[in-house]
């Protein structure tokens, strides 16, 4: 399980484009595209090294007006995916 104190940071060589309904991530080294929904795009934009998992969940909770446990679950799920796909610094 993802530690709530972990501080996710997006790799510098990853390109991101915001869309009306989320965003698109392009991994230049793997030449892969990842489509993000609005929630995942919000979380992606928070992975700048200035917040830990719990802080991102708290911001999502307030921004999207969802219960904190749902926000934390969404953050864990998204960051786990980002890690699995190699989009974050290890």
Task: Label every model-predicted segment.
Residues 29-90:
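Long, charge-rich, low-complexity alpha-helical segments
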